[in-house]
Amino acid sequence: KELKIRFKMNERLKEKNKKKNSGKEVLSFIKEQLKEWKLAKNNTKQLKDLQVKLMEVAGIPVKVQFNPARIGSTTAKTDTQSIQKRPCFLCQKNQPKEQRQLDVTWNLNLCVNPYPIVPGHLTIPAKKHTPQHVPTYLAEVYDLFKQLPTDYAVFYNGPYCGASAPDHFHFQAISKKYIPLITQYNQLKKSAKPIATQYNYINSIIGRCKSSLYYINGYACPLFAIESNGADFDELFKKLWDQLPISSEEWEPKMNIF
């Protein structure tokens, strides 16, 4: 039954995305938005004044960033009462007229972030107002990857781990070169401990998909990594998800995903 549901979802995604975007089209979209949207343009220009300090935490090199233009996001009140009082800035109806959306998957749009942490910062919100809950949209990540520039990485801040809009689901994306965890991954993996491996048969073209779960010891915080040679990594992720602690007052484990 689960395989039938997965097959139907994939068919829906194929139908919706017969004409997919390419990495070049996404870069052109960013360029056009920065040309016509003054707020995004000015805040991107301010990144030249960005201050970055290199330091070590538990022997791990860390970059600390000082970006005054991000003060609104980093100090945003995310308690239930505050969220209910403000209009959701990720809902299309509340976004400024200059902000445009690029249709990328069945449930997700792509937008330029007007308060970037680095140049080319993208926000990828759900088309419907639904809370941060990554299992709901995990199956669409693979299709999303295929439309982004090849040097981009997708990341996710959980509703209790830094998301400034926990009431509206969204991924984010930036160039991999700005993410120390990714640039340091090969070195970090040397301390990886295998936890589980899963094989799934996809179809006669793709064949068998292998996904492996690792625990990496030696990072500044607990770190799990999943490596997969196909799109079928979400089952292993959900098994990990089920083992992570969740507070009785919260709906998702405290996690960030890259």
Locate the predicted segments by residue.
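Active-site microenvironments that recognize anionic phosphate/pyrophosphate groups
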Residues: L3-E140, Y152, G158-P159, K176-F258
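Short, well-ordered alpha-helical packing segments
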Residues: Y142-F145
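Active-site nucleotide-donor binding segment shared across nucleotidyl transfer reactions
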Residues: L148-P166
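Phosphate-group recognition and catalysis centered on beta-loop-alpha active-site segments
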Residues: A173
